[in-house]
């Protein structure tokens, strides 16, 4: 159980970092497309 929560937390952290870098590097229209893809 502990391993699963650690894995989940790592995945969450990775996706947060990925989204943050994408937003930092991408022009506005790409961000809008990414947000639509998440919904």
UniProtKB/Swiss-Prot annotation:
Gene Ontology cellular component annotations, sorted alphabetically: cytoplasm; extracellular region
Recorded superkingdom: Bacteria
UniProt KW keywords: Competence, Cytoplasm, Secreted
Localization per record: Secreted; Cytoplasm
This protein's record includes keyword Metal-binding: no
Summary of subunit composition and partner proteins: Interacts with RapF and inhibits its interaction with ComA.
Miscellaneous field: RapF and PhrF pair of proteins acts synergistically with RapC and CSF in the overall regulation of the ComA transcription factor. CSF, PhrF and PhrK stimulate ComA-dependent gene expression to different levels and are all required for full expression of genes activated by ComA.
Record protein name field: RapF inhibitor
Natural source organism: Bacillus subtilis (strain 168)
